[in-house]
Structure formats: C-alpha cells, structure tokens
Amino acid sequence: MELIDKIKMSVKDLDLFYGDKQALKKINMDIKENKVTALIGPSGCGKSTFIRTLNRMNDLIEDVTIKGNISVDGEDIYTSDDVINLRTKVGMVFQKPNPFPMSIYDNVAYGPRTHGLRDKKQLDKIVEESLKGAAIWDEVKDRLKSSALGLSGGQQQRICIARAIAMRPEVILMDEPTSALDPISTLKVEELIEDLKKDYTIVIVTHNMQQAARISDETAFFLNGEVIEFSDTKTMFTTPVDKRTEDYITGRFG
C-alpha cells in the first residue's frame, strides 16, 4: 500500500500586494511534512516574498495586503493574533548569517529564555541538543562562552540554524541560506538540511539549480509572482511540463 504524505502547510489562492503593486498572484501549494520544498526562479519573481508569508514576516512591512489562506496543520495562520506562537512553530533562517553579538551559548539559549525558561540544566540540554542538531557541537563545545561573531560564515549559519531549532519548530524556512557561504560550508549546510528533514518540514529559497536538484523533494518554479510549475523535483528537472520552466532550469534566462 502506498503511503500518503501528510500535508503540513497548505496555501490557497494567495495574493499579496505592496500598495497597488501585486507581488504574488493566486498561489496554491501543499507543503508536505518532513520533506524539503525548494522555491526557485529569477530575482524579483516573488519567492522570498512568498516564504515570508509562511510565518507572517510580511506583517512588518507597511502597506502590505494579503488575501487567500495559509494553514499549518489545518489552522489558518492569519486568523490568529498569536504571531509569536506561529514563529515558534515556523522558524526562519536568513540569507546572511545573523548571530547575535553574544556568546555561542547565549545565541542558542536566546529563544527559550525569551519564552521564560530559566532552569540552567534545561537550557544546557537544549543548547547541546540544538548544536548537535545543527551539526556544529563538536566544533564549538569547548568555547560556548566565546562570541558567535568570531566563527566563520559557515559556522555562524549553523549557529543560526541551531538557534532556530532550539525553539522546537515544526517547519524551518530558509531564505537562500548558503548564498553567502563558500563551497565547503555550503556542502555542510546541504548535508545538514538532508538530516534535518527527518524531524522538520523545510522550505528553502535557492538561486542554485544544482542545489535544488540535490537537496529538495519538491520544487516550485516562480515567475512574475506566479507559480508556473510545482512538482516533485526529479520530474521538474527531467521532464518539466511548462516551456518556461525548461527555459529557466536549462539557463536560457534567469
């Protein structure tokens, strides 16, 4: 019997406007649990705008209007006022590593402390588990009190991933998490993403076609604020349905 993948997030008829300018048009997408979904497309196509709707980061921008429905486990994220709880459940890792100017330990403990956790044993456990989960524990375990700003770019990005998973999210959003990293650091983060999907649902924006092909289970191709094609990654990269998808992934435009 074929197992049916559980839908973790569902997007229905999503429109987004910046003032009068429409940036996203009628987006429909089911994001499967414990899978990596890649968002690809040329610069300015709407993929970063889209990923930020998934944990309401666009709420911070003035003059934004959002129509349609986005749900996590069947619950509409835009009908609740509890944005903090949403961002606990749906974590985010940004393009440029952005560790806080504090120790490695305090970076990872920041979220749990903000939510009221003060017990040192529990914090120690969360910090260690999160750093192990982000595949950086062995590199930093002897210098947890050192500043996170003293780490390499690749290490800083893994600290940011550890900081995200310290909140025990269910979904991790990644907006071009390796674009500022060297090839070796990129490979480490890609290996980490492959490992993380056992416990988390991951949505990643990437400009790198090879990266999308390597690490994702499903891929959505965005163009001019629309999803042109959304399918399992192997199908998209071998037998795309839409000519525009084929033109993009073969490098005819971008």
UniProtKB/Swiss-Prot annotation:
Name the Gene Ontology molecular function terms of this record.
Answer: ATP binding; ATP hydrolysis activity; ATPase-coupled phosphate ion transmembrane transporter activity
Q: Does the keyword Ribonucleoprotein apply?
A: no
User: What main location does UniProt list?
Assistant: membrane
PROSITE patterns noted in UniProt: ABC_TRANSPORTER_1, ABC_TRANSPORTER_2, PSTB
Every ABC transporter domain range: 9-249
Q: Name one GO cellular component term.
A: plasma membrane
Localization (cell): Cell membrane
Q: Name one GO biological process term.
A: phosphate ion transmembrane transport
SMART domains noted in UniProt: AAA (SM00382)
Provide this UniProt record's keywords sorted from A to Z.
Answer: ATP-binding, Cell membrane, Membrane, Nucleotide-binding, Phosphate transport, Translocase, Transport
Q: Does the keyword Cell membrane apply?
A: yes
NCBIfam families associated with the record = 3a0107s01c2
According to the record's subunit comment, the protein's assembly and interactions are:
The complex is composed of two ATP-binding proteins (PstB), two transmembrane proteins (PstC and PstA) and a solute-binding protein (PstS).
Query: What does the sequence similarity comment in the record state about its family?
Result: Belongs to the ABC transporter superfamily. Phosphate importer (TC 3.A.1.7) family.
The entry's protein name is Phosphate import ATP-binding protein PstB
Q: What is the lineage of its organism?
A: Bacteria, Bacillati, Bacillota, Clostridia, Peptostreptococcales
